[in-house]
């Protein structure tokens, strides 16, 4: 990369900041949510000096205030393939495959995000990106009409496409071009109050699935939520309710724990927004419900062994009493079942359930001859090294689907005959998705190697 080029990490930060400003204007409640999260995070850090020191030690304190994830939905393989190229300019790459059809949502998805520890520390912005699966629309005529509508739309500006080409050709962008790229790329994610279909078509799409209407009826894949990261989601949810926000009844993901794992999410219901639906006589006024506010708390990244235990316990909690996650006692069921999941970092580490980042302490740096021959666990026990949880940077398929469903209007759960199709998704993407377990394994291995360096 030429010395005159701006780092992809810097472009990503500029883009994340610009998107946050835009979304704050479009959805003012998002601004309230960000302020609420910042206040709770400050309280948690003031009350928990050990956590504050851990974040500082792992270059995670600075990223906390800027940390966001967004979510979008696209309609065609061409849109998805171009998005992959757009995100690559910002150092964001597809990680993981998520099949949401199992939860009655006709999409499959990936998360575009940075991969290396250094890039994540600079700015961990991630975008959960879903591709509509038209083949899951049962009505053949509606499926064909949807494909025709989507084929006509252009979700990228000419300027954005030209700058993507330029970045790929030259190996990067200089400052002025990077700023122009952010400006042009942002247009893809902007909300438009004018639909591209008439009201009867919108209703037909809506009857097929609310999300089909959201993808097909508009000019582009408006950002449907932007999520700040909190250090205490239970306190944040209580504060949301105090502020009069229609918060979800259940926090998605694992229960509250001493050692948070994976991801917990909650949100307020989607906003009903005024939309103009065009027709030959000037059009109709209507409404659309899609965009909502969400917060998340991120915990320890689990190994395949840890993830298998998590999935098993989650399934147990959902199946108990046959009420899934909708019963009023779900929180208690979850807490009871997860008593079987170790809740101290020594056990989690020693049983190989989670990934950890190892670093020498001052005592370890002062005694290189002792460090050279001792296993990592012995170094930790002797106070010569620390082992801090590696943050889970990805998503939960069940959680993602639950958030989609609850915010699109509640209880609808439908089973689709076709389910996962990773091969078709990767073909549309133009590359294979990165394996999240391999990424965490590499981060842990790099930290272990650095102990001996």
Name each model-derived stretch.
Residues 1-453:
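Extended, well-ordered protein cores
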